[in-house]
A protein has these predicted regions:
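N-terminal Sec signal peptide and the immediately downstream disordered periplasmic leader
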Residues: 1-87, 197, 245-246, 316, ...
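Membrane-embedded beta-barrel scaffold of Gram-negative outer-membrane proteins
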Residues: 317-344, 486, 492-500, 520-578, ...
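Structural signature of Gram-negative outer-membrane beta-barrels, strongest in the C-terminal barrel
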Residues: 240-244, 371-372, 377, 383-387, ...
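Acidic, small-polar-rich N-terminal luminal/periplasmic segments of exported/outer-membrane proteins
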Residues: 39-175, 531
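Outer-membrane beta-barrel translocator/receptor signature
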Residues: 117-119, 131, 140-149, 154-221, ...
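C-terminal beta-signal and adjacent terminal beta-strands/loops
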Residues: 648-656, 677-732
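Gram-negative outer-membrane beta-barrel transporters
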Residues: 31, 379, 427, 434, ...
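Periplasmic-side early beta-strands and strand-to-turn transitions of outer-membrane beta-barrels
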Residues: 166, 174-175, 183, 194-294, ...
């Protein structure tokens, strides 16, 4: 098994430090939680909604990382994948711009088909996003980002086996104001972001936000247009309506458009299958079509087809809240629609070997109603949830090897799922608190799959009632039990058992060379045994949080690619590890953050392409991961200068569940830096930045097609990017 060494002296000091440290609704005008101070000499509290009510982060008995507006800005976190650099245990895989899937503590879903839901759930202003293809590339005008590690099977429930990520946008308030940012960078980057807040009356306020992202392709294609460019526009319009002293409604309209981006961000590498069928890199050898890339630079490629990516995402959310002396009623209604066109050169070579296209449509409606209340030592929350979504996809493939003509895999997925949940919390004493919760989910799904190949000897039309397994229902019970102990002020110890589940489904094979009985797979279930601590010390100048966990993972939905056959199989797994997060203000205006993650995953039996089984590690689960950030501000030129550096180091990791030699990503580090000046009135700011300062080459995804084409194709993280941003802010 893959192992990585870690400096023992650092581990010892962190453990010692952890042992020593163990010795209501916002007002109408409030738009953001109190930012973590980087200009004062003490840490401010961070407000989160990890339990669907506002709490101090240090009072929540769970492993949570949160970024407020100030932190997002000073770290220069702009894209939805940038946050992985400062969240212990968080990775991501991204098949170009088309699909983004987070990996938290090794829990993920590597299937690139759009109909799959991810086990790390994404919430946008309390609304669950079921489609992995709907996650846009840009974060803008956010109040907060929260990352909750571990199963969230009670209050959030749906498919949050590994955890969840919440994006909370800035809301309209009663004061006029706004901002505008303009960025110019290398690769022709031209980006802008802005927001304008305006009260319309004593009871109505509006906020409009937008972001545009454009850059030329990172990959130089000697045969045509550069690859991996971006041309995206996103916007959000919100109305906040105060209907009475005790109630308000928030209406949000939002949309994203990606226009004619060049997709297929693959880099080619020669490979051959070994005796087990897993790929081994064979540098210098041509692939099966006779091609060999002479360049060792992954950003120099030769592809005969220009890929394409068009996407439109739009939706609406209505959030209502009614407060009484006894309880608060909250309603969240959400509608989301996605349309996508995607095409790629799958073989990554200048020869016409295999092209793959996707035409994808998705729509969902969800509704949540919940009540929460309590008095004295007792607090409670109960609610119901319903989601209905439909997705359809056509995946035509073209290849000279198609003896019976080009083919098209067509499939449609429908899901109707109600759920009910409840959680109670009781203070046993001033120091002890007990918490218990449960959720029941009914998942009613149907799948219609057609492999359309008119000249083929036989075709497969997988649909009920001809195939009864094409219509399935699942009864999922999840929940948690937790005990919290406060031995002293500003210190919390907790222990919990959490159970999460993700519904079963179907593989959506694009080749059609598959038996009907291999399409369905069962739900996965994860039980998390966890202990942790949270502490604030050194006169509110230091914060240290830590956790240890053990995952018992039943029927993990593992993704396998055998030739052109894409299949999901249930396998058991275990996963254990922990995290530490340290935040310091050692000097006035100096902020230091440090994070550590350790993982040990084990899958006893995976399927091998050549037959048989072998043990493996979970994909994208490095044994060690470190992140750090330092930010300092000082007065100069009548204003404030700021400087910051941050980065992340990952030990070696496998990118696919097959654990082949070709998908082993060696350890690597990525570093970023930022230098800025802010005017005395806080209206103007100018900043220069560089990301991936050392221009480190590292892969975030790998696809083993060695047995089919004689190569593997990978997706690399962005190269070095740099530029400057000018910002103007007005009002509050």
């Amino acid at each position: 098994m893959l192992r990585a060494k870690f400096p023992g002296w650092l581990t010892t000091r962190l453990v010692a430090l952890s042992l020593l440290s163990a010795g209501s609704t916002g007002s109408w005008a409030d738009n953001a939680s109190t930012p973590e101070s980087s200009t004062g000499d003490k840490l401010e509290e961070i407000i989160v909604t990890a339990q669907k009510r506002e709490q101090n982060l240090q009072d929540v008995g769970a492993s949570v990382t949160a970024f407020d507006t100030a932190t997002l800005q000073r770290l220069g976190l702009h894209g939805v994948t940038d946050i992985v650099e400062q969240v212990p245990g968080l990775q991501f895989n991204q098949y170009g711009a088309t699909v983004t899937v987070y990996n938290l503590r090794g829990v993920s879903q590597n299937d690139f088909n759009d109909h799959q839901e991810a086990p790390v759930a994404v919430y946008d202003d309390e609304a669950y996003v079921a489609s992995t293809g709907a996650l846009a590339g840009t974060m803008y005008d956010l109040q907060r980002v929260e990352v909750l590690r571990g199963p969230q099977g009670t209050l959030f429930g749906r498919n949050a086996t590994g955890g969840l990520i919440q994006y909370i946008s800035n809301k309209p308030d009663s004061e006029s104001g706004g901002y505008f940012d303009f960025t110019r960078g290398n690769y022709g980057a031209i980006n802008s972001e802005g927001a304008m807040n305006q009260p319309l009356s004593d009871s109505v306020a509006a906020r409009f936000s937008f972001a545009t992202d454009y850059h030329e392709g990172y990959i130089e294609n000697t045969l045509g247009h550069p690859i991996e460019d971006q041309n995206q526009v996103a916007a959000r319009l919100q109305f906040r309506i105060k209907t009475s002293d005790n109630s308000e409604i928030l209406v949000k309209l939002h949309g994203v458009n990606n226009d004619h981006e060049t997709a297929g961000d693959y880099t080619w590498a020669s490979a051959r299958p070994d005796a087990t069928g897993r790929a081994v890199l064979t540098p210098g050898q041509p692939d099966f079509s006779g091609y060999n890339n002479p360049s060792n630079n992954p950003f120099d490629q030769e592809q005969d087809r220009r890929g394409i990516f068009n996407r439109t995402v739009w939706g609406a959310t209505v959030h209502g809240e009614w407060r009484t002396d006894a309880f608060t009623l909250t309603s969240v209604s959400d509608y989301l629609r996605v349309q996508k066109r995607y095409g790629e050169d799958s073989d990554g070579s200048p020869n016409f070997v295999f092209d793959f296209d996707v035409f994808y449509h998705f729509q969902q409606f969800s509704q949540e109603l919940r009540l929460n209340g309590g008095s004295g030592p007792f607090r409670w929350l109960a609610g119901v949830y319903y989601i209905n979504y439909r997705s359809s996809q056509n995946s035509p493939t073209t290849s000279p090897a198609n003896l019976f003509g080009d083919a098209d895999a067509q499939f449609a997925l429908r899901d109707s799922s109600p759920a009910g949940f409840a959680q109670i919390e009781y203070d046993l004493s001033d120091r002890w608190t007990a918490l218990v919760g449960a959720r029941y989910t009914y998942d009613d799904k149907s799948f219609d799959y057609l492999y359309d190949c008119p000249l083929c000897p036989q075709t497969l039309h997988y649909v009920a009632p001809d195939y009864p397994a094409a219509s399935r229902a699942f009864n999922l019970v999840t929940g948690k039990a937790e005990i919290d102990y406060k031995p002293m002020k500003d210190t919390l110890l907790y222990a919990s058992v959490n159970r999460g589940a993700k519904g079963g489904g179907w593989s959506a094979d694009t080749s059609g060379i598959v038996s009907p009985e291999t399409l369905p797979y069962n739900p996965e279930k994860l039980t998390d045994y966890e202990v942790g601590f949270k502490s604030t010390f050194w006169d509110q100048r230091a914060r240290l949080n830590g956790s240890l966990f053990y995952y018992d993972y039943k029927d993990y939905q593992g993704f396998f690619l055998f030739g052109t056959n894409t299949v999901v199989r249930n396998v058991n797994a275990t996963d254990k590890g922990g995290e530490l997060e340290l935040t310091l203000v050692p000097l006035q205006r100096l902020n230091v953050q440090f994070g550590l993650s350790h993982l040990e995953s084990f899958v006893p039996a995976i399927l091998l392409p050549a037959g048989g089984t072998a043990s493996a590690q979970l994909p994208q689960a490095p044994h060690w991961s470190l992140n750090a950030a330092v930010h300092y501000e000082w007065p100069m030129f009548g204003g404030t200068m700021s400087a910051g550096v941050d980065g992340k180091w990952n030990s070696a990791q496998y990118l696919e569940l097959e654990n082949s030699q070709s998908d082993l990503q060696a350890s690597y580090a990525v570093a970023n830096a930022r230098l800025g000046f802010r005017s005395a009135d806080d209206h103007w700011e100018v900043a220069a930045f560089v990301r991936n300062a050392t221009n480190k080459y590292y892969r975030i995804y790998n696809l083993d097609v060695a047995g089919l084409f004689g190569d593997v194709v990978g997706v690399y993280g962005p190269p070095r990017t740099y530029g400057a941003t000018v910002s103007y802010r007005w009002g509050r």
